[in-house]
Amino acid sequence: MLDFWFEFASTYSYPAALRIGGLARARGVSLRWRPFLLGPLFKAQGWDNSPFNIYPAKGRYMWRDLARVCEELGAPFVRPAVFPQNTIQASRVALVALAEGWGEDFCRAVYAAEFGEGRDVGVPETVVGVLSGLKKDAAAVIERAQTDPIKLTLRRNTEEAQARGIFGAPSFVTADGELFWGNDRLEAALNWAKR
């Protein structure tokens, strides 16, 4: 078992989300997709923004590196005008989708819209468009995503991520509690989970 801790605002979670399903299946590792919010974790570290915005050189490097990673994967990449984006609604919808068995498709589609097309997933119309593209009743799904149990689950996921020592996304946690951080550590996490 491997927990995949992801945040839609996380750039490197995009390629991880594209790769993790096939790589896990090939190794026989079961996955649990765990959406959470980075904002509260950053705030606890004294940051009021993404470190990629706080440190411009780091941000420039990240955007160039992400473009290279996407090119290597054959995945589209368009830098969004807004970064980081407000991902609360998309994260809540992801919890509904994961509970209903279509979460992986939804998550990959959100990442494709955000980093493959440069769209703002913080805008409700973008999430509606993703849901419509998946042939889902967007109004009904969004209504379910606004319920107190879903809101509480996202809050608890974020609190659990912090309690586990997660400080960024993507992060991967194995059944024995080993933490791996970053898209470039995905294979190592899967190999550890397979042991």
Residue positions per predicted region:
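C-terminal cap of thioredoxin/glutaredoxin-like
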Residues: 2, 7-29, 34, 109-195
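Structural alpha/beta surface segment adjacent to cysteine/selenocysteine redox centers
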Residues: 14-117
